[in-house]
């Protein structure tokens, strides 16, 4: 009593306390960062190594394996995958959530150093690492185009000037430059001219290497001066290499230009990038795992004018893709939803109380509670994101509940003629314990979420804490500010109703009277109600088992990614044509705003595309509908497939895949893996639950297998080293010398001119100079035949791995796909040597599925414990929790009605319902117990009276919660696919529970009371006997 009086009789102190809470919240709001979701990125580090010309199998065995053995010893590595392709190896290390990325990077560098002695000596550079996940979609893509500068020059500007500057911006983890390669002097050899002059490819390589040398020359001194010696020992351009003498034939000089075409070109001509229909260089910017995407993008945008000034005016620097606009739009939608929810909740209060003065009180309490929460969010290191703002939206219904319960009880005493301050004190004292019970039991629901580990726990923690803090502040406000305002603002008389509201009042009275009559009948037919309650429990189980499930709702971020997978033997020229064809099909779609793409590098038969859709207001279809439409058009392109997927804010795993979900096959027997992977992939491709089924196993690339006749080689004076060097010189784009410039270093690249390598007859033109100086054709000591070879070799851990990726067709859920894959694996009879498991997001979904039921049970158990402690009873908490089955049925039915799968967001809704619907039972039980203790009423009379007295606040709190969630259901625009499942779950659960619990709770209360009496009599009878 004294606690409540302290605030009621000291209005200035109470007001200032509330003002202080509000001001702290405003300051916190201004300093909170903005993000699409809570920080849930796994720490990921990518290690890259190169050995130009090496086959994928050579890269896997000689580069990937030694590095994997060393990297695998690092503490905290949760997953290690690698992919080796032509001349390149990439290892992805995913660490535990709690692993510091900087500490992990130091360990990675130490592991690379430890493995250095085991790596091939011919590697042009040491392995490097980056603190970024290559499978993440870029947060921003910049493009460089020009009508006057070549692609190589544009690439040079991008990699030498722009990329290093952008990499230094806070939050940037990696800047990947694509679309071409660095400038280089390319030497295209003419095999016939070399043969005619008696010059070997090694002669040319040695001559060029010796002619371009950068060594110190020293200095000259006399008594008074010092001269630095400088020579023309370096060759910089193709024109300077052209007259280089590489050999003498019969006394005549053979110059490089006589046997080769020398051009200023690029290091790797098998690279191409485009934006819309124009050649372009792409800068794909990815953030650090712990970085805030909005802050990082804003920082990059702020530096763009400076970046533009560092490159020539003839180069056009543009933003081709930016993830931030849709994130900002989504958050604006949530903020609007929050404002609408607050307005609707206050409208509900006004309709029930029919008093402007009384409505002002919750209209003040709600904003104070919500705004004050921002301060706690800032102190906890949270952000303004979709989940935290949804928590505040849902909190509007919760925080007003406390104020409603206090306000309604005080108003009841005022209408009975009590003085305002006395009514405030008495009314608050009566319901103080009720409000405390409702708030503590609601917070208790979220305790299991706070203890939940892994990605789901990290994702839901911010939601749970935000909502719990809002409820805590609401509890304080409802017991301090609300009774004070009631005592000083409300009058000791019945409120004057506006004429237009009298009808609503009469309707509410009629509704209450009808409820009283129906309740009397129900209390006389308790068995029927008991059967209904048991039926709802059974229906819950059946609905949960049968409802489609997924991990997270499919988002429409306005950005699509596309992976191109072509025939494994396709040439680069043909692949570039495929890229152009696919980009034209997509660019012509009316919903597409911008398209960028690239192909080439170590995997010629693959490419990537990044598609920006028009804003949601300018298109009628969702991203998935657009993908479905484009899929039909893209299927007509022969020889290649383009797999599209909508970019999501949550991406798990480091595998770069052409679809959203992955299923990984592992084996220690590579032959078994290569045998079974095609069978499994073909089987999965026939399943209607899966779409865009593809695999990263590519072991049918065209290969020319050369077989040396070692006896003949020995007789002719040729060793294998010389023969292999010939092939590398001719076909490996071999980097034979370095050109040093002030800003960068460039290469001299040698190969047989592409004009002479159009078919396998090019091998017949190759020759080796033996130890006697004779030119020996390759065909004299080698035979060749076409064969198949892998384009890439993949590992997970230290096992061979193949990853099958898939998307979900419209109307199918991840649970449908998972079950279908499990059935298919069983039907195929896959041997034990080949192990299959879900990876990435699909793996997290499997883990979450296993813990969902446990989480719900833990929440119910926690609420039971808290209620048991508060009521000092084993029975009353069961009465209160009997409201849950009807809410569960309503939520699951609503999800099925709206064709929404059960996701992590829907799970949040179920958890919230556990806290919401029990409030009605708490109000009933509290007043029934009070009536039994002090009113000398029978249990049936007490619960009947409690139901009637609490009918108005029950309707108010339920409708407040319902109208608080309704804008989530009706919201459209950006991010609505995240909000709607939460709103659907809550609204469906509230409607069903409101219809049933007004009757089931009194019946359960009487059942347990009779059960208690029956057990309390038995000991007495035993003593009498």
Swiss-Prot record:
Keyword Cell inner membrane: yes
GO cellular component, one term: plasma membrane
InterPro entries noted in UniProt: AcrB_DN_DC_subdom, Acrflvin-R, Multidrug-R_MdtC
Example GO molecular function: xenobiotic transmembrane transporter activity
Membrane topology: Multi-pass membrane protein
UniProt keyword annotation of Cytoplasm present: no
Induction or repression: The mdtABC operon is transcriptionally activated by BaeR.
Lineage top rank: taxon: Bacteria
Swiss-Prot/TrEMBL keywords: Cell inner membrane, Cell membrane, Membrane, Transmembrane, Transmembrane helix, Transport
Gene3D superfamilies listed in its UniProt record: Multidrug efflux transporter AcrB pore domain, Multidrug efflux transporter AcrB pore domain like, Multidrug efflux transporter AcrB TolC docking domain, DN and DC subdomains, Multidrug efflux transporter AcrB transmembrane domain
Main location group: membrane
Biological role: The MdtABC tripartite complex confers resistance against novobiocin and deoxycholate.
Protein family per UniProt: Belongs to the resistance-nodulation-cell division (RND) (TC 2.A.6) family. MdtC subfamily.
Quaternary structure annotation from Swiss-Prot or TrEMBL: Part of a tripartite efflux system composed of MdtA, MdtB and MdtC. MdtC forms a heteromultimer with MdtB.
HAMAP family: MdtC
Protein name according to UniProt: Multidrug resistance protein MdtC
Organism per entry: Escherichia coli (strain UTI89 / UPEC)
